[in-house]
Amino acid sequence: MSASTQGRRIVVVGAGVGGLAAAARLAHQGFDVQVFEKTQGPGGRCNRLQVDGFTWDLGPTIVLMPEVFEETFRAVGRRIEDYLTLLRCDPNYRVHFRDRSDVTFTSELCAMGRELERVEPGSYARYLAFLAQGRVQYRTSLDHLVGRNYAGLRDYLSPRVLARIFQVRAHRRMYADVSRFFQDERLRAAMTFQTMYLGVSPYASPAVYGLLPFTELGVGIWFPKGGLYAIPQALERLAREEGVRFHYGAPVERILTDGGRTRGVRLEGGEVVEADAVLCNADLPYAYEKLLDPKATTLKRKEKLRYTSSGYMLYLGMKRRYPELLHHNVVFGRDYKGSFDDIFEFRVPEDPSFYVNAPTRTDASLAPEGKDALYVLVPVPHQHPDLDWKVEGPKVRAKFFARMAELGFPSLESDIEVERRSSTPDDWAGTFNLARGSGFGLSQNFTQIGPFRPSNQDARVKNLFFVGASTQPGTGLPTVLISARLVTERLMTWAHAQGVSLSPRTAAATPLEGVAA
């Protein structure tokens, strides 16, 4: 070990969005950072498919809370505009109901008012009150709850924090809380389905997630030019500029521990890479089960952990464009509550709700001229012994096309030019090492948020840290970026306690030439 790197060597396991953002932040603070990733490129589940001129996002499809993305770049002395072009989606999305009615949601208040009054007379005034509550939930959560590390349960249960928890209505259930503002079941569904971004049911999730529809409608929905994969590309470029070294096609077989410390990692080929600390961006339950010696470390309540739902995905290259579709389209099944009950009781809904993404409405470069690259997400249960996705997958696919035919797209299946592949919970588990094929990581029910969620620092192995959707503060792209900030702060505290001497960069490095944004 050279004197220049003593105590500063960090190995990051995984090049997902959280690992990339944390690597850039740590390198900016003066750490010597290497990233090891099992696949051939960055992004994790925030990835893409490209075939014959069609481009599909593989996982996430929207950007919410742009201020969190801006802060990530600002923290290392950069401007997000030099790395990403964020395009606003407006109208935000259209929601289709089983009675063949629909509502187009927009951030433009007058237009939104007309849509709401058409469905439920008198609802616009209550909608404004709903947005006002959502703004309080949004700002309070970001500024006082989600955006900080907790020293422990006592810290979380302090009078100051408890007051904030009640202020954001985390003690209430989201569907019940939203029902105070809207009487029409269609609007109640349209204002609560956003919990599926987190893979949880609005009937079981805290009402604080009312911040999600506010974020969409009050702050806006955004889309990076080139698709969501532009985000990990930009973060990788940023990290490289800060001196981070990347090793792709390099699966980590084991995080090595000895005497209450980690000393690095062993790759599948047998090579040992020594480190002063390890930051794991692999899905946390998978890491504890597959990468760590259970005798050396512990994950409390592991057998009681609850997981989010998963998704059955279709990536369709179409022979033509469908002007009836917006960029974001949500289609509800007949029984809104029943579909959530089915998913979380490990049944595939008979009449599923689903989401259709048509990104050429915002970025025409994602498909050949006059054609559409459609992304379809059908929420389904995560892996379960009673579900065989070789059997269930084709059934879900057939239900999707049948429902689209009812909506006025009878030739959709015959219009397919390229069908790259479908993704099931089995694929999410196999490709991205997601425990149980759970597409969004650990659930964010009340018993798995705040300090009840697995910590970003192991309790026994003090130089082992975690970043990503299954650690604090939670799932979703902006939350994972906050996770990267929080674990950097936690790791900095650890390093200072060890007497590590750091020399943070005080000015932005010169951008690398020839590195794709």
Curated annotation (Swiss-Prot):
Disulfide bridge positions per record: none
Pfam families in UniProt: Amino_oxidase
Cofactor: FAD
GO biological process, one term: carotenoid biosynthetic process
InterPro entries given in the database record: Amino_oxidase, Carotenoid/retinoid_OxRdtase, FAD/NAD-bd_sf, Phytoene_DH_bac_CS
Domain of life: Bacteria
Enzyme class name: oxidoreductase
Catalytic activity: 15-cis-phytoene + 2 A = all-trans-zeta-carotene + 2 AH2
Keywords per UniProt: Carotenoid biosynthesis, FAD, Flavoprotein, NAD, Oxidoreductase
Keyword Disulfide bond set for record: no
Record EC number: 1.3.99.29
Involved pathway(s): Carotenoid biosynthesis; lycopene biosynthesis
GO molecular function, one term: oxidoreductase activity, acting on the CH-CH group of donors
Annotated positions binding FAD: 11-44
Keyword Flavoprotein: yes
Family per record: Belongs to the carotenoid/retinoid oxidoreductase family.
Protein's name in the database: zeta-carotene-forming phytoene desaturase
Organism: Myxococcus xanthus
